[in-house]
Swiss-Prot record:
It holds the Pfam family YbaB_DNA_bd. The keyword DNA-binding applies. Belongs to the YbaB/EbfC family. This is Nucleoid-associated protein Cpar_0834.
């Protein structure tokens, strides 16, 4: 069995790290939105799961319980959409990167 080329593996790891840093920067710019109550409450989050904006229709402000429920629902929808978007971006960036199973095979593991 041939010995793995550690220089090539280190280069691949460095490239993968740089690529993932780029993805993290891109995720900050991507925005997902969630809404609840037919649009009475809207939330926007970025791809890093940070809440950017929350808007509430002033007409529903008298019903605190409903506002709270709608805020939670809108934020959760936005976070779910953001998580899916982030996962897609990471998978796109990971194309061709080091596969852990391949590393195991190089070292005689099961992979």
């Amino acid at each position: 069995m041939a010995m793995p080329n550690f220089g090539d593996m280190m280069k691949q790891l460095q490239e993968a790290g740089a690529k993932m840093q780029d993805v993290q920067k891109q995720l900050e710019k991507l925005v997902s939105e969630g809404e609840a109550g037919g649009g009475m409450v809207k939330a926007k989050v970025n791809g890093r799961q940070k809440l950017l904006e929350l808007s509430i229709d002033p007409e529903i402000m008298d019903d605190v319980d409903m506002v709270q429920d709608l805020v939670v629902a809108a934020v959760n929808k936005a976070l779910d959409a953001s998580a899916q978007l982030a996962q897609n971006e990471i998978q796109k960036a990971a194309g061709g990167m080091i596969n852990p199973a391949d590393l195991l095979k190089q070292f005689g593991g099961q992979g």
